[in-house]
Amino acid sequence: MMHPVASSNPAFCGPGKPSCLNEDAMRAADQFDIYSSQQSKYSHTVNHKPMVCQRQDPLNETHLQTTSGRSIEIKDELKKKKNLNRSGKRGRPSGTTKSAGYRTSTGRPLGTTKAAGFKTSPGRPLGTTKAAGYKVSPGRPPGKKQQAFRCSSDA
Protein backbone atom coordinates (compact mmCIF):
# COMPACT_ATOMS: atom_id res chain seq x y z
CA MET A 1 0.00 0.00 0.00
CA MET A 2 1.44 3.35 -1.00
CA HIS A 3 1.40 6.34 1.33
CA PRO A 4 1.69 9.91 0.05
CA VAL A 5 5.01 11.48 0.99
CA ALA A 6 5.21 15.19 1.64
CA SER A 7 8.24 16.95 0.24
CA SER A 8 9.28 20.52 -0.39
CA ASN A 9 11.27 19.46 -3.47
CA PRO A 10 9.44 20.59 -6.65
CA ALA A 11 11.06 17.76 -8.66
CA PHE A 12 9.38 15.15 -6.46
CA CYS A 13 6.46 13.50 -8.21
CA GLY A 14 3.65 12.00 -6.25
CA PRO A 15 0.63 10.07 -7.44
CA GLY A 16 -1.89 12.24 -9.20
CA LYS A 17 0.47 15.01 -10.42
CA PRO A 18 0.28 15.05 -14.22
CA SER A 19 2.91 17.78 -14.54
CA CYS A 20 5.60 15.41 -13.28
CA LEU A 21 4.67 12.78 -15.84
CA ASN A 22 5.01 15.30 -18.64
CA GLU A 23 8.46 16.34 -17.40
CA ASP A 24 9.61 12.72 -17.45
CA ALA A 25 8.44 12.32 -21.03
CA MET A 26 10.34 15.44 -22.09
CA ARG A 27 13.53 14.33 -20.35
CA ALA A 28 13.43 10.92 -22.04
CA ALA A 29 13.00 12.49 -25.47
CA ASP A 30 15.92 14.86 -24.86
CA GLN A 31 18.17 11.99 -23.88
CA PHE A 32 17.40 10.10 -27.07
CA ASP A 33 18.22 13.15 -29.16
CA ILE A 34 21.63 13.41 -27.52
CA TYR A 35 22.45 9.78 -28.28
CA SER A 36 21.40 9.99 -31.90
CA SER A 37 23.48 13.13 -32.49
CA GLN A 38 26.56 11.50 -30.95
CA GLN A 39 26.15 8.41 -33.11
CA SER A 40 25.97 10.45 -36.28
CA LYS A 41 29.05 12.41 -35.21
CA TYR A 42 31.14 9.23 -34.82
CA SER A 43 29.79 7.38 -37.82
CA HIS A 44 31.31 9.91 -40.26
CA THR A 45 34.81 9.77 -38.82
CA VAL A 46 35.21 6.00 -38.67
CA ASN A 47 36.90 4.54 -41.73
CA HIS A 48 36.80 0.83 -42.44
CA LYS A 49 39.92 -0.34 -44.20
CA PRO A 50 39.95 -3.79 -45.76
CA MET A 51 42.40 -6.01 -43.92
CA VAL A 52 44.75 -8.31 -45.77
CA CYS A 53 44.77 -11.79 -44.27
CA GLN A 54 47.47 -14.36 -44.83
CA ARG A 55 46.74 -18.04 -44.40
CA GLN A 56 49.09 -20.01 -42.23
CA ASP A 57 47.45 -23.42 -42.60
CA PRO A 58 50.57 -25.43 -43.49
CA LEU A 59 52.32 -24.27 -40.33
CA ASN A 60 49.30 -25.03 -38.12
CA GLU A 61 48.76 -28.49 -39.62
CA THR A 62 52.33 -29.57 -39.03
CA HIS A 63 52.20 -28.20 -35.50
CA LEU A 64 49.00 -30.14 -34.79
CA GLN A 65 50.50 -33.34 -36.16
CA THR A 66 53.56 -33.15 -33.95
CA THR A 67 51.60 -32.43 -30.78
CA SER A 68 49.00 -35.12 -31.43
CA GLY A 69 51.72 -37.65 -32.24
CA ARG A 70 53.51 -36.85 -29.01
CA SER A 71 50.35 -37.15 -26.94
CA ILE A 72 49.68 -40.64 -28.35
CA GLU A 73 53.21 -41.73 -27.51
CA ILE A 74 52.91 -40.33 -23.99
CA LYS A 75 49.63 -42.19 -23.45
CA ASP A 76 51.21 -45.46 -24.59
CA GLU A 77 54.17 -44.96 -22.25
CA LEU A 78 51.85 -44.27 -19.32
CA LYS A 79 49.92 -47.48 -20.02
CA LYS A 80 53.15 -49.47 -20.07
CA LYS A 81 54.32 -47.92 -16.80
CA LYS A 82 51.03 -48.65 -15.06
CA ASN A 83 51.24 -52.38 -15.86
CA LEU A 84 54.71 -52.92 -14.39
CA ASN A 85 54.91 -55.37 -11.46
CA ARG A 86 51.22 -56.01 -11.57
CA SER A 87 49.94 -59.15 -9.96
CA GLY A 88 47.11 -60.24 -7.74
CA LYS A 89 43.51 -61.16 -8.15
CA ARG A 90 42.94 -59.30 -11.38
CA GLY A 91 44.48 -61.59 -13.96
CA ARG A 92 48.06 -62.60 -14.51
CA PRO A 93 51.05 -60.33 -13.94
CA SER A 94 52.21 -58.30 -16.90
CA GLY A 95 54.96 -59.94 -18.88
CA THR A 96 53.59 -63.46 -18.50
CA THR A 97 51.94 -65.46 -21.24
CA LYS A 98 48.67 -67.33 -21.38
CA SER A 99 50.51 -70.63 -21.47
CA ALA A 100 51.99 -69.93 -18.03
CA GLY A 101 48.79 -71.32 -16.51
CA TYR A 102 47.22 -68.25 -14.95
CA ARG A 103 43.47 -68.47 -14.75
CA THR A 104 40.94 -65.78 -15.43
CA SER A 105 38.94 -64.11 -12.70
CA THR A 106 36.13 -66.65 -13.21
CA GLY A 107 38.37 -69.61 -12.38
CA ARG A 108 38.62 -71.26 -15.78
CA PRO A 109 41.83 -71.60 -17.76
CA LEU A 110 42.74 -68.77 -20.10
CA GLY A 111 41.67 -69.16 -23.67
CA THR A 112 38.41 -70.87 -22.71
CA THR A 113 34.95 -69.41 -22.69
CA LYS A 114 31.96 -69.90 -20.43
CA ALA A 115 30.38 -71.89 -23.22
CA ALA A 116 33.19 -74.43 -22.91
CA GLY A 117 31.67 -75.47 -19.60
CA PHE A 118 34.26 -74.22 -17.11
CA LYS A 119 32.17 -73.12 -14.18
CA THR A 120 34.80 -73.78 -11.51
CA SER A 121 38.26 -75.23 -11.53
CA PRO A 122 38.05 -78.37 -13.66
CA GLY A 123 38.40 -81.12 -11.05
CA ARG A 124 35.08 -82.68 -11.94
CA PRO A 125 33.44 -83.35 -15.29
CA LEU A 126 32.73 -80.24 -17.27
CA GLY A 127 29.26 -78.83 -16.99
CA THR A 128 28.68 -80.23 -13.49
CA THR A 129 28.25 -78.22 -10.33
CA LYS A 130 29.06 -78.87 -6.69
CA ALA A 131 25.40 -79.68 -6.13
CA ALA A 132 25.75 -82.66 -8.46
CA GLY A 133 27.77 -84.38 -5.74
CA TYR A 134 31.20 -84.37 -7.32
CA LYS A 135 34.18 -83.74 -5.09
CA VAL A 136 36.92 -81.67 -6.58
CA SER A 137 39.81 -84.11 -6.23
CA PRO A 138 38.76 -87.71 -7.03
CA GLY A 139 37.19 -87.39 -10.46
CA ARG A 140 34.45 -89.93 -9.70
CA PRO A 141 31.07 -89.48 -8.02
CA PRO A 142 31.10 -89.92 -4.23
CA GLY A 143 29.37 -92.95 -2.74
CA LYS A 144 30.51 -95.40 -5.39
CA LYS A 145 33.11 -97.81 -4.15
CA GLN A 146 35.87 -99.09 -6.32
CA GLN A 147 34.82 -102.41 -7.66
CA ALA A 148 37.46 -105.04 -7.48
CA PHE A 149 38.03 -106.86 -10.68
CA ARG A 150 36.80 -110.40 -10.29
CA CYS A 151 38.00 -113.03 -12.52
CA SER A 152 35.43 -115.30 -14.01
CA SER A 153 37.65 -118.25 -13.26
CA ASP A 154 37.08 -117.80 -9.47
CA ALA A 155 33.41 -118.48 -9.76
UniProtKB/Swiss-Prot annotation:
Cross-link entry Glycyl lysine isopeptide (Lys-Gly) (interchain with G-Cter in SUMO2), positions: K75
Domain of life: Eukaryota
Pfam family, one: DUF5568
Phosphoserine PTM positions: S37, S121
Disordered as annotated region, ranges: 1-20, 40-155
Coiled-coil residues: none
Biased composition (Basic residues): 80-92
Sorted UniProt keywords: Isopeptide bond, Phosphoprotein, Ubl conjugation
Residue ranges with Polar residues bias: 1-10, 57-70, 94-107
Family of the protein in this entry: Belongs to the UPF0461 family.
PANTHER family: UPF0461 PROTEIN C5ORF24
Name of the featured protein: UPF0461 protein C5orf24 homolog
Organism: Pongo abelii
